[in-house]
Structure formats: structure tokens, C-alpha cells
């Protein structure tokens, strides 16, 4: 299948690669179906792109590429809701805020997107019990809130 996007050109994908977000993503609750594709320009980033609205693509990155000791716990209810049987079946990304100044590019470590790659379902979580910043600089080791 093909998706002609506004910012990322023509993206090709298989229907089996569609990730369903039953609750949508905060700010885009009306959109439920997305594909995750590597960004061509940079192997650090991915694009989580809606297949329901060709204008909506969210830049994301793996938090583990940024902060090696990033961790949080999924409770039993969330594990069941996302049908997670094995931790190897999940892929975690976080939203990135781009900026023309490299030092001002940030990643939101407070709200990871958890994707069950076996079941192709996902959800963005808000971490209550862990003190991660919403704006963590991608290209320097300092935290700014």
C-alpha cells in the first residue's frame, strides 16, 4: 500500500504493519491507525505516520539511544491491555520536538509510546511515578524542564 504524505513523500507499507492505537495519541485521539517508518535523513529518528491523515506524522526516537538507563514499569493491566506476553515483543519510542538549532531538539521522556510489534497495537503512556522530563535535550547531556 502507498501513502502520499505532505512532509515525507510517498511511503510504502504493508497492511500487516499498521499499528492500531485504540485510544489514539494525545492530541490526535481521532486517529487510530499509524505506520512506523525509519526517517530517511537520520537513522536516529522514526516517523509515526497516520494512515488516516496524510498530514500527520510524528517524529519519534528510541529513548534507549538517548538515555541508556531509561526504564519504567508496565503494570499488569497495561500489559494485558496491550497483549504483551514477552518483553521482546515491545518497541518503545518517544516523541521528538525538532528545532532549527540542534541543541534545542528535545525528546519527551515522560510519555513513552509502547508498541506491541507482535500484535501491532500501541499506546502512549504518561509516566506518573518516574521523574523524567518532557523536554530532554537530544544532543547534550543536560536536563531542562
Swiss-Prot record:
GO terms for biological process: bacterial-type flagellum assembly; regulation of translation. The keyword Chaperone applies. The keyword Iron-sulfur does not apply. It comes from the Bacteria. Coiled coil: none annotated. Its main location: cytoplasm. Transmembrane segments: none annotated. Acts as an anti-CsrA protein, binds CsrA and prevents it from repressing translation of its target genes, one of which is flagellin. Binds to flagellin and participates in the assembly of the flagellum. Interacts with translational regulator CsrA and flagellin(s). Belongs to the FliW family. This is Flagellar assembly factor FliW. It comes from Clostridium kluyveri (strain ATCC 8527 / DSM 555 / NBRC 12016 / NCIMB 10680 / K1).
Amino acid at each position: 500500500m502507498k501513502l502520499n504524505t505532505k512532509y515525507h513523500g510517498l511511503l510504502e507499507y504493508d497492511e500487516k504493519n499498521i499499528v492500531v492505537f485504540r485510544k489514539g495519541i494525545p492530541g490526535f485521539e481521532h486517529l487510530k491507525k499509524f505506520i512506523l517508518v525509519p526517517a530517511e535523513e537520520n537513522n536516529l529518528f522514526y516517523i509515526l505516520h497516520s494512515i488516516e491523515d496524510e498530514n500527520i506524522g510524528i517524529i519519534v526516537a528510541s529513548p534507549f539511544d538517548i538515555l541508556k538507563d531509561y526504564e519504567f514499569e508496565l503494570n499488569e493491566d497495561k500489559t494485558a491491555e496491550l497483549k504483551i506476553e514477552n518483553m521482546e515483543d515491545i518497541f518503545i519510542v518517544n516523541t521528538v520536538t525538532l528545532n532549527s538549532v540542534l541543541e534545542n531538539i528535545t525528546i519527551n521522556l515522560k510519555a513513552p509510546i509502547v508498541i506491541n510489534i507482535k500484535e501491532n497495537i500501541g499506546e502512549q503512556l504518561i509516566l506518573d511515578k518516574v521523574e523524567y522530563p518532557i523536554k530532554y535535550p537530544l544532543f547534550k547531556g543536560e536536563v531542562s524542564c
